[in-house]
Amino acid sequence: MALGWYELKLAKDGQFMFNLKAANSQVILTSELYRSRSAAENGIASVQKNGLDEKNFEVRVAKNDKPYFVLKAKNHQEIGRSQYYSSSVSAKKGIVSVTKNAASTVIKDLTNEA
């Protein structure tokens, strides 16, 4: 089975962020903003490590009543979060997708495309 990949990007304010994409190109996890490239790369490494275990995920419900999930490191710090889903079942399928794709070592550097 083909794995997804990470896309490292520059945000509009010059900070770094990344998305984890599934093999079908769908974004399945979005990071927080990082002040440096190395911090964002460390975030990717944390997803590669912590994203393999479903125990590190937490399903939440947004103010608009849409479920989403967050991935947390062992220190309980949030590493990334999902999009909003139509149901908790869909959010849980998203978690399974992250666990299947988190180990990817493919990082597409899009920081020069901003």
UniProtKB/Swiss-Prot annotation:
The keyword Repeat applies. Belongs to the UPF0339 family. Duplicated subfamily. InterPro entries: DUF1508, UPF0339_domain, YegP-like_sf. This is UPF0339 protein PM0519. Sequence repeats lie at residues 11-59, 62-110. Keywords: Repeat. It comes from the Bacteria. SUPFAM superfamilies: YegP-like.
